[in-house]
A protein has these predicted regions:
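Interdomain hinge/linker at the junction between the two RecA-like core domains of SF2 helicases
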Residues: 163-210
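Conserved strand-helix element at the start of the C-terminal RecA-like helicase core
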Residues: 52-66, 100-102, 204-234
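A short beta-strand element within the Helicase C-terminal
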Residues: 283-297
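Conserved SF2 helicase motif VI
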Residues: 299-328
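The feature captures the C-terminal accessory region of ATP-dependent helicases
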Residues: 49, 353-625
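Conserved Walker A/P-loop ATP-binding site and its immediately adjacent core
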Residues: 38, 42-80, 104, 166-168, ...
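SF2 helicase catalytic motif II
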Residues: 103-106, 114-158
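Inter-Walker segment of RecA-like/P-loop motor cores
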Residues: 71-114, 254-261
Length: 625
C-alpha cells in the first residue's frame, strides 16, 4: 500500500491540513487515514463536512458524547430502534445526515433503509473510526467485523485512527486504498514514566501516595476483577468512580459497588478507573489537570497488557482540555510487571494460519461436494470450529482481521517478557520520551504470587529455585539486603521449600539447572537431597571415627574384601545411612573401604583381600581427640 503525507502545523486541526493538500477540508475516499495525533478533529471534520455520513465507532460512550455535542447526529446502538432510524432518514429538515453507530448497530441501519440501502451506499460517506479496534477486539467481540462487507461496498469510504495497525484484507489493495499519514511539523512527544516492578500492589500504592495531592487521578486498568481488588485493597471506594461496560457495572454492583457507570459522568471523582471501553475515541473534558496511571498486572489477567503503539497513545489522548502550559495532563505513568510468556514468532503464526487455511479449504471443498445433508451438517460444524477461533467470519469466509489479530496478539505479548522489551517498544513508537525505572525487591509480591499459583508443582519448584538464585545474586551485589527475611518469605510459598533450599547448598550445579532450564518433581528433589544427606553422613566425623576405630587394628594387615563390605554396611546402618536401595546413590561394595583408606588389592589368595595401608589424609583431622 502506497503512503502519502499531509502536514500539520502547530495549533492546526485535521481540516486545515487536508485543505492545504487537497483544497477542501474533507476526508478523501479510499484512504487509511493515520492521524498520528489524537484530538485533531477527524470525527469533527466528518460531522461538519457537507455530505451524508455513517461513522462507525467502536463503543457506545463516544457515540453518546458526540451526539450530546451535535444535535443533528443520530446515535445507533442497542437502545436505538429501527423506527427511530427510519424517522431520522426521512427527516428532510436535516440536510446532511450524520449517523454514528456501533458495529453491532450497523445492521439496524441496513434494515431501516430497506430498498434505499443501495442508494445510501452510493451517496453516503462511510468512516470507520478507531479502525485498529477491528484487529484488536475481534477475538472476543466477533460482531465488531460485521459491517466490513458493507463498508467495502460504499462508493466513498475511509478508515481512520491515530494508531492504525497494518491490515491484510485484500479489498484494500483491490480498491486502491492508500495510507494517508499526518506528519506534524512540531515536536509532539509526550513524557511517560515507565515503572517495571515485581511488587505490583506495593508500587501502585506508592504511586497513589505520591499523587494524593492531585485533584484528579485517572487509572486505566482492563480488568473488573483487578479493579475490584485495587479499590478494596487501597480503600478507594468512597473517592472513586469506575467506568466500564454495562456488564461490568452489573458485576461490580454484585460486589457492593454503587459507583460504577457505563458512560462519562461529570464531575469526575478523585480516583477514576477506566476499562478498555474508554481507551479510545472518548473525549474527556476537565477543568482540572489530571494525572494518568496505566496499570498492567499479568498475574491477574493478560488482557491488562497495553500496546505502546496503540492503546497507550490513545489513553493519553482522551484528555482534550489544554491548560495554560499547553498540556492536557500533569503526568503519565505506566506500572507493569513482566512474565516469561509463551510467545509465537511471526513465522510460527504464519505456519499455524497456513494449517488452518489448508483445513478450511479442504472442508469447504468437501462441503460443496457433499450431497448428503447429514454430511453437510457435520462439515459445517467443523467449519464453525475454525470460525470459533475467529479465523472465519459469520459468512464462513476467511476473516482477515482475525488473522491480523493473531499476529498482533503475539507482538504485544512479546513486549511483556522483560522490562527492556517494553521500554524499547515505547521508544520505537517515537511518540514518548520514556523515563525508565525498575522498582524491584529482592523477592517481590508478584514473585510470591507466581510461585504459589503455579500451574503445577514442577513449575512451582522451578520458579522457587529461580527466585532463590536471583536472591543470591542480588545479595552478592548489595550487602544491605536482609536475606533471611526474603528466605522466610519464600519458605511460606511452598511446604517443601526447605528441601529446595537444602539442595541449593548441597548440590549447586543441579540446583542451577532446575532454576534455569526446568523444574523437577518433589520426589526427584527428595531423592537428590537424600543422596546429599547420605554423602554428608558417610563422611561425617562420627562415621569416620567408627570406621577408623574398627579398621585401625588392620592397618598394614590383610582383611577379606567381603568382610570390609559387611563392616562398612553395619556402620552405615548404625548411622541411618541409606544404601544399596533403589534410587539411592550410596552403595556399599567391596570397594567402599577405598573411599576411607589407602588400600592395595591382595588377589593372589582366596578369598580376595585388601591390605589396609593408612587412613586417607583428608580424614586425619576428624579422628583427633
Amino acid at each position: 500500500m502506497n503512503t502519502e503525507y499531509v502536514y500539520l502545523g502547530q495549533n492546526e486541526y485535521l481540516g486545515d491540513a487536508l485543505k492545504s493538500k487537497y483544497g477542501k477540508d474533507c476526508i478523501p475516499s479510499s484512504v487509511i487515514l493515520d492521524k498520528t495525533l489524537t484530538g485533531i478533529g477527524a470525527t469533527f471534520t466528518e460531522i461538519h463536512t457537507k455530505r451524508n455520513s455513517i461513522i462507525i465507532e467502536p463503543n457506545v460512550p463516544v457515540i453518546v458524547g458526540k451526539c450530546q455535542k451535535e444535535s443533528n447526529c443520530l446515535g445507533v446502538y442497542s437502545e436505538t430502534t429501527v423506527s427511530e432510524i427510519k424517522k431520522y432518514l426521512n427527516n428532510d429538515a436535516i440536510k446532511y445526515k450524520k449517523i454514528l453507530t456501533t458495529p453491532e448497530g450497523f445492521k439496524k441501519i441496513r434494515k431501516a433503509a430497506g430498498n434505499s440501502y443501495n442508494q445510501i451506499q452510493q451517496t453516503y460517506f462511510c468512516l470507520f473510526d478507531e479502525c485498529e479496534k477491528l484487529t484488536q477486539d475481534c477475538d472476543y467481540r466477533a460482531a465488531i467485523t460485521q459491517p466490513v462487507y458493507d463498508f467495502f461496498e460504499f462508493k466513498e469510504k475511509a478508515f481512520v485512527s491515530a494508531t492504525p495497525l497494518n491490515v491484510s484484507h485484500p479489498e484494500f489493495e483491490n480498491q486502491d486504498f492508500i495510507r494517508l499519514k499526518v506528519e506534524p511539523l512540531f515536536d509532539y512527544r509526550k513524557n511517560l514514566h515507565l515503572i517495571i516492578t515485581n511488587s505490583y500492589e506495593r508500587t501502585v500504592r506508592e504511586e497513589l501516595e505520591r499523587l494524593k495531592g492531585s485533584p484528579c487521578v485517572c487509572i486505566f486498568l482492563n480488568s473488573i476483577t483487578g479493579i475490584n481488588a485495587l479499590v478494596n485493597s487501597l480503600n478507594l471506594k468512597e473517592e472513586s468512580r469506575i467506568y466500564c461496560s454495562e456488564d461490568g457495572v452489573k458485576k461490580l454492583k454484585e460486589c457492593g459497588f454503587d459507583n460504577a457507570v457505563s458512560s462519562i459522568n461529570y464531575p469526575l471523582a478523585k480516583y477514576n478507573i477506566f476499562t478498555s471501553r474508554f481507551y479510545s475515541a472518548v473525549d474527556i473534558d476537565l477543568n482540572v489537570k489530571p494525572d494518568i496511571l496505566i496499570l498492567t498486572n499479568l498475574n491477574q489477567a493478560h488482557h491488562t497488557m497495553v500496546d505502546p503503539y496503540t492503546e497507550a497513545i490513545q489513553i493519553q489522548g482522551r484528555f482534550r482540555t489544554k491548560f495554560e502550559d499547553g498540556h492536557t495532563y500533569n503526568s503519565l505513568t505506566h506500572i507493569t510487571n513482566t512474565q516469561d510468556l509463551e510467545v509465537l514468532s511471526d513465522e510460527e503464526v504464519t505456519q499455524m494460519i497456513d494449517e488452518y487455511t489448508i483445513t478450511y479449504r479442504e472442508l469447504l471443498q468437501r462441503y460443496h461436494s457433499a450431497t448428503d445433508e447429514a454430511r453437510k451438517k457435520g462439515l459445517k460444524q467443523q467449519l464453525k470450529r475454525i470460525c470459533e477461533d475467529y479465523l472465519l467470519d459469520e459468512r464462513m469466509n476467511i476473516d482477515y482481521f482475525g488473522i491480523d489479530n493473531k499476529y498482533n496478539e503475539e507482538r504485544v505479548k512479546r513486549y511483556y517478557s522483560s522490562g527492556e522489551s517494553i521500554r524499547q517498544a515505547y521508544e520505537a513508537t517515537e511518540f514518548f520520551n520514556v523515563e525508565y525505572e525498575e522498582r524491584r525487591q529482592a523477592v517481590g509480591e508478584d514473585d510470591i504470587f507466581r510461585i504459589k499459583y503455579a500451574p503445577s508443582e514442577k513449575v512451582r519448584i522451578q520458579r522457587l529455585a529461580f527466585a532463590l538464585q536471583q536472591l543470591d545474586l542480588q545479595c552478592s551485589q548489595n550487602e544491605n539486603i536482609n536475606k533471611s527475611f526474603f528466605i522466610d518469605l519464600l519458605r511460606n510459598c511452598y511446604e517443601y521449600a526447605d528441601l529446595l533450599i537444602e539442595m541449593k547448598e548441597a548440590v549447586p550445579i543441579g540446583f542451577a539447572h532446575i532454576a534455569s532450564f526446568g523444574g523437577a518433581s518433589r520426589k526427584e528433589i527428595e531423592k537428590i537431597v537424600a543422596d546429599s544427606r547420605n554423602e554428608k553422613r558417610r563422611f561425617s566425623k562420627e562415621v569416620i571415627q567408627d570406621i577408623y576405630n574398627v579398621f585401625q587394628k588392620h592397618i598394614s594387615q590383610k582383611i577379606a574384601k567381603e568382610e570390609c563390605k559387611e563392616i562398612v554396611g553395619e556402620i552405615y546402618k548404625k548411622h541411618n545411612i541409606l544404601h544399596n536401595q533403589k534410587d539411592i546413590k550410596a552403595k556399599v561394595s567391596q570397594q567402599t573401604i577405598g573411599e576411607y583408606f589407602k588400600v592395595a588389592p591382595q588377589n593372589s589368595e582366596k578369598p580376595n583381600k585388601w591390605r589396609i595401608e593408612y587412613l586417607l589424609p583428608q580424614f586425619e583431622e576428624l579422628i583427633k581427640e
